[in-house]
Amino acid sequence: MGRFIFVSFGLLVVFVSLSGTGADCPSGWSSYEGHCYKLFNQQSQWAHAEKFCTLQHTGGHLVSFHSTEEADFVVKLAFQNFGHGIFWMGLSNVWNQCSWQWSNAAKLKYEAWAEIYCVYFKSTNNKWRSRACRMEAYFVCEFQA
């Protein structure tokens, strides 16, 4: 009897330990390093995709990459699920946070940008490219678990 309790307790400890190794993501989301990711099979403009991601889960946004390994994980996920395609990620110049300065050191007081650009990746590699944010692409949402 004592051996049965010991073995049962040991199995419980192993189960609890293993269940904590991945992020606790909702059904349909994939986990990696404490974050949850979901690819959406619909195309949208960047701003609409970002808004959609914020509505999917508290703290949700378009995916942001903080390491080569994370980017490789998401790109592989995109290719496995969709084959070839382009996917928005959360990088853009929409908020115009860059500190532009004229070569004569004058501050930028007048702007006439032609386009606002957002960044996407292809599901065939993890190289980033930019295109007009008004264009449509698939997208990946992410939140921290």
UniProtKB/Swiss-Prot annotation:
It is found in: Secreted. The keyword Kinase does not apply. Belongs to the snaclec family. Inhibits thrombin-induced fibrinogen clotting and factor Xa-induced prothrombin activation. Binds to thrombin and prothrombin exosites. Disulfide bonds join C25-C36, C53-C141, C118-C133. One of its GO terms (molecular function) is toxin activity. It comes from Gloydius brevicauda (Korean slamosa snake). Keywords: Blood coagulation cascade inhibiting toxin, Disulfide bond, Hemostasis impairing toxin, Metal-binding, Secreted, Signal, Toxin. SUPFAM superfamilies: C-type lectin-like. PANTHER family: MANNOSE, PHOSPHOLIPASE, LECTIN RECEPTOR RELATED. Gene3D superfamilies: Mannose-Binding Protein A, subunit A. The keyword Metal-binding applies. This is Snaclec salmorin subunit B. Residues 1-23 form the signal peptide. Expressed by the venom gland. SMART domains: CLECT.
